[in-house]
UniProtKB/Swiss-Prot annotation:
Presence of the UniProt keyword Magnesium in the record: yes
Gene label: rnc
Residue intervals of the DRBM domain: 152-222
Catalysed reaction, written as an equation: Endonucleolytic cleavage to 5'-phosphomonoester
PROSITE patterns reported for this sequence: DS_RBD (PS50137), RNASE_3_1 (PS00517), RNASE_3_2 (PS50142)
Broad class of where this protein is predominantly found: cytoplasm
Gene3D superfamilies, per database record: 3.30.160.20, Ribonuclease III domain
GO biological process entries: mRNA processing; regulation of gene expression; rRNA processing; tRNA processing
Recorded superkingdom: Bacteria
This protein's name: Ribonuclease 3
């Protein structure tokens, strides 16, 4: 496939094509691989995203800025960028890695994206790298809620209830299934003030609590979108759009 097409999607045409090829080369393919470029790109990426958040969200404190940045530069987010760039066909992998589906592996895709950022930095300097990174992240930031990104379902449910001066949810393990080494936990999440009671399962108590909290928050948003009101028990399958952070956390 033509590297020129990838360069157009990336928003940078390389003066040194060898840097682009190296950025796309996994260590399974040969000695001149992309791990050092990945290291460099990770640092440039973190700085650029930090600057973008600092300028965009003047009211966020240090802790919230760090939380949002961590979620924007994590593996899943970088793998999403790789998908938008349609990067998989351009990766240079060893035969074994190729056969095992490495071109679809999120870790390999994320590493290659960071390596590309590092390669752009070496090829044309910081301003060019910043432009490329901003081009990838501006549309992402347009759909980000900094108040919820990176917060898990239990935290969001707690904040929702506290904002309405309601008691915190009650989590109860109602059943366990399976052998000791592969147990499934079934947890109930109850919000008495809203007459909500839902259950969910998970491979650990924590995972089950997170899944139950997500269902409870969906139900609470139906029963009490802004203010508390009485009603029948909310259905555990309430269909609502929750912050993306919750959906990712409990997959």
């Amino acid at each position: 496939m033509s590297l020129a097409t990838l360069e157009t999607r990336l928003g940078h045409h390389f003066g040194d094509q060898a840097l682009l090829e190296q950025a796309l080369t996994h260590r399974s393919h040969g000695a001149r691989h992309n791990e050092r470029l990945e290291f460099l790109g990770d640092s440039v990426l973190n700085f650029v995203v930090a600057a973008m958040l600092f300028e965009r969200y003047a009211k966020l404190d240090e802790g919230d800025l760090s939380r949002v940045r961590a979620n924007l530069v994590k593996q899943a987010s970088l793998a999403d960028i790789a998908q938008r760039l349609e990067l998989s066909p351009y990766l240079r992998l060893g035969e074994g890695e190729m056969k095992s589906g490495g071109f679809r592996r999120p870790s390999i895709l994320a590493d290659a994206v960071e390596a590309l950022f590092g390669a752009v930095f070496l090829d044309a300097g910081f301003d060019a790298a910043r432009k490329v990174i901003e081009q990838q992240y501006v549309p992402v930031l347009a759909n980000v809620d900094p108040e919820t990104l990176g917060k898990d379902a239990k935290t969001l449910l707690q904040e929702f209830l506290q904002g309405r001066k309601l008691a915190l949810p009650l989590y109860t393990v109602v059943a366990t299934h399976g052998a000791a080494h592969s147990q499934q936990f079934e947890v109930e999440c109850a919000i008495p003030a809203l007459e909500i009671k839902v259950t969910a399962a998970g491979a650990s108590r924590r995972a089950a609590e997170q899944s139950a909290a997500k269902l409870a928050l969906e139900a609470a948003l139906v029963v009490s979108p802004r203010a508390t009101r009485k009603g029948g028990r909310a259905r555990k399958t309430a269909q609502l759009s929750l912050p993306v952070a919750v959906a990712q956390e409990v997959k």
